[in-house]
UniProtKB/Swiss-Prot annotation:
KW Ion transport (keyword) present: no
Domain spans labelled ACT: 685-759
Pathway assigned in UniProt: Purine metabolism; ppGpp biosynthesis; ppGpp from GDP: step 1/1
Record's keyword annotation contains Manganese: yes
UniProt catalytic activity: guanosine 3',5'-bis(diphosphate) + H2O = GDP + diphosphate + H(+)
Task of the protein: In eubacteria ppGpp (guanosine 3'-diphosphate 5'-diphosphate) is a mediator of the stringent response that coordinates a variety of cellular activities in response to changes in nutritional abundance. This enzyme catalyzes the degradation of ppGpp into GDP. It may also be capable of catalyzing the synthesis of ppGpp.
Keywords: Hydrolase, Manganese
Protein name, UniProt field: Probable guanosine-3',5'-bis(diphosphate) 3'-pyrophosphohydrolase
Gene name of the encoded protein: spoT
InterPro entries, per database record: ACT-like_dom_sf (IPR045865), ACT_dom (IPR002912), Beta-grasp_dom_sf (IPR012675), HD/PDEase_dom (IPR003607), HD_domain (IPR006674), NT_sf (IPR043519), RelA/Spo_fam (IPR004811), RelA/SpoT_AH_RIS (IPR045600)
Leading EC class: hydrolase
Gene3D superfamilies the record matches: 3.10.20.30, 3.30.70.260, Beta Polymerase, domain 2, Hypothetical protein af1432
Cofactor: Mn(2+)
Domain (HD) ranges: 76-175
């Protein structure tokens, strides 16, 4: 960025502080302006005095916004002053604070970026330009525009991460003053804040911004729920604070007895949106949310963190499965702390966090606690390259974003992988791998290396053979077993969650099976449009234009992309409609195809014979049985094995360890028949760990009965001071039903863990 000589350089009135009467300045800014005035009076150059950049930026913004008012009626300058103050509180450098004052100047006045650069330097101008561009993005627009706006935002962040921090401060103050807008605008801005900016603040570790953005969004999106929860929190505050003070007194004595002299005990109230999220996602009442109030212990060293943890577990009984060590395994945003949940007073669960002062600073201020440019004085240190470790998530987004042609899929993957929490698993050598929550061994394999994923045969998780679609949990040790003649399955696309794995699987099918993919693409398009006139449509000029609009050179490439899942048939049909194609006539046959207002849905043809009614497709007329080692369910990837004897085909889950023992020529591809009306059930073994109390088994069985799940067998094992182990054999129709009932049981307040038991 270079200054343009032809543009006039505006004048900065250095005496502006003496003329301010319409707003009350914060004390820090008053002190800064007074010091700057003294330096000028003592003969220093106004452009080189120690406080010049911040003060000159304020005076410049004050003059430009002097005649402007916000919707609330207050002077407009109050907003830039508030934004600059938020950035100062985060520890931002002078360029950031100056950008806070100037961030609306280019958009709302006649001043150009070149003039900003001439007055305040390239670094400040670059930040102002970045924020100005972000302000023009509409994240609630059409999917294609939304995807492009996301891409531009991440590129701006990669160039200088401070741009998005200034934007977050701008958004936070706008949310604080949202009352002056119409209800419709309030909801639109609140939705965008909740979906985009609060998760970004979380990824950057700026907890102070994150919780307030979430609570303010909640206030405008769900006003009735917000007021109700706010009232309940206030109503119970006295009891909570009394219990916390008693707990503090108990711990204060024991910590000193342990030799930990310097520490701080803080109450940590749960924020309103966090309470609402738990109530809705876990189907719990307000009274069942045990961590509405929590305790934080701040000590001086990492060693004292673990000593303090020992004290806590001596004083209060820890609840098994509720301990997390984020010191040994930090979050991607560099958050570190020990989390434990104990049975506190009156046997109510109490969450306790333990961290050092430095860890606490990082937890509150996030990336602001790590900015290296403050030490070196160079802006280039704020870029992505020098802080790779802290921004692996952003680097991954930049790596794969250009590979996805389908805008809708890009936005969905983005929201899942940027805004969801991560899960941390280990390689057999102890290396930590961070994956999106819900990731499977297939996602893990492709994270290790593309070829590991391509030749994956199965996976051992914690030493046990599990299905390749198993959802990984924190702390799992994952080992991928490969075989030279193994290759990806299209079924993997149904359960992988990371964009990199999804893209590499599709690339493999794109390269290796082009003819099959074209045929499959035709079939998918035929389902959307109907068979009549399809040939004419595929040869038409509008179809060629549609292929080009979808970034393919020709229709065959588009069909291949459909076949291996790079783009969806729904997206293709939508592009056709955008081209205003209503009918395409076949000149030879006079047949026509019509693009309906919505995609055609063809109901499945009822099976004509008993053979067609088989749950398994691909072995019609053959004897088969469901393998007892792995108990596959409809909806799970399966493989057939030709048995030695008269038992016919044995149906196994893909990834079953018994498949490893089989000769390759005995394996045959099979799949579940989606058209069957055979509603049989299949046995599934699950193990539940629950708090040992009277009636816990009854409550679990009632939950199963309410969902029409038959229980074949139940067994309970208890040991004093340990959770109850409940083993159940239940009848399940398909994999989706299993996932649904497991989620409902996990949400029960007494349930600590639940897993499916598979021997194969």
């Amino acid at each position: 960025m270079n200054a343009v000589a032809a543009l006039p350089t505006p004048t900065i009135h250095t005496t502006c502080a003496q003329d301010i009467h319409d707003i009350e300045l914060p004390q820090w800014l008053e002190d800064c302006l007074q010091q700057w005035q003294r330096e000028i009076e003592q003969g220093q150059d106004e452009t080189t005095a120690p406080h010049c950049l911040i003060c000159r930026a304020f005076c410049f913004a004050y003059d430009l916004h002097a005649q402007q008012r916000r919707k609330s009626g207050e002077p407009y300058i109050a907003h830039p002053v508030a934004v600059a103050g938020l950035l100062r509180d985060l520890g931002g450098d002078e360029a950031m604070i100056a950008a806070g004052f100037l961030h609306d100047v280019v958009e709302d006045t006649d001043i150009s970026i070149e003039q900003i650069e001439a007055l305040f330097g390239e670094e400040t101008a670059s930040l102002v330009e970045g924020v100005t561009k972000l302000s023009k993005f509409n994240f609630s627009s059409t999917t294609e525009h939304q995807a492009e706006n996301f891409r531009r935002m991440f590129l701006a962040m990669a160039k200088d991460i401070r741009v998005i921090v200034v934007k977050l401060a701008d958004r936070l103050h706008n949310m604080r003053t949202l009352d002056a807008l119409s209800p419709e605008k309030q909801r639109r801005i609140a939705r965008e804040t909740k979906d985009i900016f609060a998760p970004l603040a979380n990824r950057l570790g700026i907890w102070r911004f994150k919780w307030e953005l979430e609570d303010l969004s909640f206030k405008y999106l769900e006003p009735d729920s917000y007021r109700k929860i706010q009232s309940l929190v206030v109503e119970k505050r006295g009891d909570r604070e009394s219990r916390l003070e008693t707990v503090k007194d108990m711990l204060r004595f024991r910590l000193r007895d342990e030799g930990i002299e310097h520490f701080e005990l803080q109450g940590r109230p749960k924020h309103l949106y966090g309470i609402y999220y738990k109530m809705t996602s876990q189907d719990k009442a307000f009274e069942e949310i045990y961590d509405i109030a929590a305790l934080r212990i701040i000590v001086e060293s990492k060693g004292e963190c673990y000593r303090a943890l020992s004290v806590v577990h001596d004083v209060f009984k820890p609840i098994p499965g509720r301990f997390k060590d984020y010191i040994g395994l930090p979050k991607p945003n560099r958050y570190q702390s020990l989390h434990t949940t104990v049975l506190g007073l009156t046997s109510r669960p109490l969450e306790i966090q333990i961290r050092t002062e430095e860890m606490h600073h990082v937890a509150e201020y996030g990336i602001a606690a790590h900015w290296k440019y403050k030490e070196s004085g160079g802006s280039e240190n704020a870029t992505l390259t020098s802080t790779d470790e802290k921004f692996t998530w952003l680097r991954q987004l930049l790596d794969w974003q250009s590979d996805l042609k389908d805008a809708q899929e890009y936005v969905e993957n983005l929201k899942q992988n940027l805004f969801d929490d991560d899960v941390y698993v280990f390689t057999p050598k102890g290396e930590v791998i961070s994956l999106a929550r819900g990731a499977t061994p297939v996602d893990f394999a492709y994270r290790i290396h593309t070829e590991v994923g391509h030749h994956m045969k199965g996976a051992r998780v914690n030493g046990q053979w599990l299905g390749v679609d198993t959802r990984l949990k924190n702390g799992d040790i994952v080992e991928i077993v490969t075989q030279k003649n193994s290759h990806p399955s299209l079924d993997w696309l149904n359960f992988v969650v990371t964009p990199s794995a999804r893209h590499r699987i599709r690339q493999w099918f794109k390269r290796s099976r082009r003819d099959e993919n074209i045929l499959r693409g035709r079939e998918l398009l035929e389902k959307e449009l109907g068979k009549t006139g399809l040939e004419a449509l595929l040869k038409s000029e509008p179809m060629q234009k549609t292929a080009e609009r979808c970034n393919y050179q020709n229709v065959e490439d588009l069909l291949a992309g459909l076949g291996y899942g790079e783009i969806t048939s729904n997206s293709v049909v939508n592009r056709l409609r955008e081209n205003n194609v209503n009918n395409v006539k076949n000149s030879q046959s006079s047949q026509e195809v019509t693009l309906a207002s919505s995609p055609q849905v063809h109901p499945p043809t009822p099976p004509a014979t008993g053979k067609d009614n088989s749950p398994i497709a691909g072995i019609e007329g053959l004897l088969y049985h469901i393998a007892g080692c792995c108990h596959p369910l409809p909806g799970e990837p399966i493989m057939g094995v030709v048995t030695r004897g008269a038992r016919g085909i044995s149906i196994h889950r893909q990834g079953c360890h018994n498949l490893e023992q089989m000769d390759g020529d005995r394996l045959i591809p099979v799949r579940w028949n989606p058209n069957t009306n055979n509603h049989q059930t299949y046995p599934v073994d699950i193990v539940i760990e629950a708090i040992d109390r009277v009636g816990v088994l009854k409550d679990i069985l009632s939950r199963l009965s309410d969902n029409h799940i038959n229980v074949r067998n139940a067994d309970v094992k208890t040991h004093l001071g340990r959770p109850a182990i409940i083993s159940l054999k239940i009848d399940i129709h398909d994999y989706q039903q299993l996932l649904g009932i497991m989620a409902k049981i996990k949400n029960m307040s007494d349930v600590m863990d639940l897993r499916r038991v598979i021997s194969g």
